[in-house]
Regions:
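Secondary-structure boundary elements
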Residues: 4-108
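Hydrophobic/aromatic-rich core segments of domains that either
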Residues: 114-161
Length: 161
């Protein structure tokens, strides 16, 4: 690659990312007063916790250790499929019934993250799904992970591959 070609490529990237920044000047300019509250008492969590023995799997200890145990229990038992069409309702109860220990019924990262987040919530660990979107006109892929909030530490992202 010549120096001229290299400069042209980097100028194009600069134009793209300058446009992205221009169109998102107000992103994140809130007043910082947003409060997120979790309701761990919903009946669906009780049903999920009991059917899948989530308290037993999570065990005792820190929220980090408990979330990690849930992740290590679920990840190898849920087959990943990028081609999954999201036809099952997006909740842990229905998704686990469809895909747990069933490699023929793979699900994508969006739904694996939903399962882990709801299983964490069912045992009282604050968690949510986070979508990671590339902001490039050349990259149309994305990824979804579970963010577990640990009061004593910063948020931790758990990714089930």
């Amino acid at each position: 690659m010549t120096k001229k070609e290299w400069n042209e490529i980097h100028q194009e990237k600069l134009r793209i990312y300058s446009g992205i920044l221009f169109h998102n000047q107000t992103f994140g300019s809130g007043n910082g007063e947003t409060v997120i509250c979790y309701d761990f008492s919903c009946p669906e969590f009780t049903r999920l916790r009991e059917k899948y023995r989530l308290e037993e799997i999570a065990g005792t200890g820190t929220d980090f250790a408990r979330a990690k145990r849930l992740m290590h229990y679920l990840a190898p038992r849920l087959h990943h499929s990028s081609w999954y069409d999201n036809h099952v309702p997006c909740n842990a109860w229905d998704l686990l019934a469809y895909s747990l220990d069933n490699p023929e019924q793979g699900i994508n990262c969006l739904n694996k993250a939903k399962i882990l987040a709801e299983c964490c919530l069912a045992v009282g660990i604050s968690a949510r799904r986070v979508s990671i979107m590339p902001y490039s006109p050349y990259d149309f892929d994305n990824h979804v992970v579970t963010e577990v909030w640990l009061c004593a530490v910063r948020p931790l992202f758990c990714c089930m591959k």
